[in-house]
Amino acid sequence: MVFDIEMIKKVYSSMKDKVDHAKKICNHPLTLSEKILYSHLWNNLDKPFLRGVDYVDFAPDRIACQDATAQMALLQFMQAGKSKVAVPTTVHCDHLIQARIGAGPDLQEAINTSNEVFNFLESVSNKYGIGFWKPGAGIIHQVVLENYAFPGGMMIGTDSHTVNAGGLGMVAIGVGGADAVDVMAGMAWELKFPKLIGVKLTGKLSGWTAAKDVILKVAGILTVKGGTGAIIEYFGPGAENLSCTGKGTICNMGAEVGATTSTFGYDKSMEKYLRATGRDEIADEANKIKDYLTGDPEVYENPEKYFDQVIEINLSELEPHINGPFSPDIATPVSKMAETLEKNNWPRKIEWGLIGSCTNSSYEDLSRASSIADQALNKNLSTKAFFGINPGSEQVRYTAERDGFLDIFEKLDAKVFTNACGPCIGQWAREGADKQEKNSIIHSFNRNFAKRADGNPNTHAFVASPEIVAAIAISGDLGFNPETDSLVNNLGKEVKLEEPTGWELPPKGFEVDDRGYIEPDEDGSNVEVVINPESKRLEKLEPFVPWDGKNITGAKLLIKAFGKCTTDHISMAGPWLRYRGHLDNISNNCLIGAVNAYNKKTNFIKSQLNGEYGGVPEIQREYKKNNISTVVVGDHNYGEGSSREHAAMEPRHLGVRVVIVKSFARIHETNLKKQGMLALTFDNESDYDLIQEDDTFNFIDLKNFSSGNQITIELVHSDGSKDIIKTNHTYNSQQIEWYREGSALNLIKKGA
């Protein structure tokens, strides 16, 4: 048994009393989100919390880490002076496997090239009581859904798509490694009490429309920052008509609208999924308190009264969507895609169709996509685009192979890649990508930022459901509408694809030979963790220097980032994943994807030391060598995307002191705070335009740093003229202590 049934029983045994107490204190019916939040408080509840205002300490039930972020998280935990993790924790090896040839060869290549890292993660897991999932076992969030997620629980994970577990009724939140280390060390986890967005679903999906289309539609409504600081709670009769893995897909892409997390109330589809994945005991326990595992009826009857925002979607009227390119919130119904392509001059020919990722790699996803592939074979159609599949877990892969789905894909010349993230995170050796030709691909993933999948800035990536991806790949035409259009087959006949079919769960049940799980030793005190001092992949961490309590003066502008600046721009993935455990080496990718506002180029900035232009990391290292502080300036939603704390640790390691932006993405702002950085926002957004390429920053009143106060900055321009700007921050007293001590980890060590 990989899940902790005693922990789950403990959560359920206290949930009723905690929720009843919260209803009395709050004096109103509760949403599901509030029930889970209030039943996971670190301290006793004596007053209701203000949404979007109050910082609250929580006690999550478990933690999940993937291999790219786990390296830095565990390197930090090793410094915390603890002998074992305080809550159930798992590590999943899914990020360090590149898609190139196919499942077997690619997995072996990953083991050959990253064995040092895998061995490190396995030994650290064994030493500190952490469950370990081997390379090839599956994608973290699919494995969590199959084994660990449970209705009414709270978990955190060092990956932004941890939110996927909301499909099984959890409040599951992506965090940086330093947040995870707090909880591993037995401390509370802090979060600003979220606002609540309610999405009422009516009707029922049919035809070509899938659960993916719900979140593609929501992304178009909310945009990439519309969910920031909020939990999205789905409810209504339409929600009950969705499968559990379909709910997971919807929650997964809540990360793309900036939501803290998303969730659904416990229902029959969740019970069926729990039982199908061998967790009857959890289903039985959940059924005993099922009224506490969903929102109160009064809330759903009058949602405008209890949610900060309400969206309503009729599933019976919802069209299939294709979102993109370059941003997951550019939502286009399939019926409008042809005219939209022409209007925007996007490449119409599809080069690749990719199915998988943590968003859409379930048994249901593969079964529905394979029904389209099977039709193509039966109707004498060939795929006009290359086709790739990443199953979500070994359990899904094994069962899908048994039931003939993989054979169907392979007969259509699809490549079946390893049970891993692969192309979704840039782990894709795509042939010809280095030519940087303008082209289009379509995938069932979650993100489609420039260069993310294949490193080519001219690849237009579009997001859709697995069944639409299959249809578009077969047609080779992004403007193809399978609901209305026909195709000409290999015999010259006009044929039409019929609506997809499939199974929510395998009729013959799930089956797996070796799921890839390694249980840790009961006592890991004798387990030795070795890091080679000459390693290029792993490096022991040195503590960051505490603040000296003085104003920062004479700081130089490093880069003023123009437009979208995601964590992919700040700390690229792809080939850089190999250095995720070596802070100094991975810092050589710091901000190399950010666009310089002064010349619109990437990784090409001016040095104020000599007036010459060069790469961001190289110039920043020179500033550090000369003991010169630097400032990074950015636009809206700075740091959106991945939870990777490297995007905060790299600039901190290289000597950047401050980041000033119009607005932050939630996880990145927290990561900056945790690493002892100063994260500020412009009081007047137009002050962004005042900042010039040769500016020097003098912080006038930083020495009075306190909760709620503004920080005043003097900008000194190269001609000697000056501007005074005001900036805001969201640091509370605890977070100011992180800044004073140099990092949150320094504070943990101080109290150990």
Briefly describe each language-model feature range.
Residues 3-4, 67, 150-284, 381, ...:
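Mobile "lid/hinge" segments at catalytic clefts and subdomain interfaces of large enzymes
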Residues 235-240, 624-664:
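Extracellular/luminal Protease-associated
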Residues 8-11, 15, 20-195, 569, ...:
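Long, structured ligand/cofactor-binding scaffold of large enzymes
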Residues 487-504, 668-738, 745-748:
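Acidic, glycine-rich flexible loop/linker segments
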Residues 5, 16-21, 36-42, 46, ...:
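Flexible inter-domain linker/hinge segments
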Residues 512-628, 632-633:
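Conserved, function-defining core regions and hallmark residues within catalytic/recognition domains
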Residues 108-112, 117, 122-157, 233-236, ...:
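Accessory "access/gating" subregions that flank catalytic or transport cores
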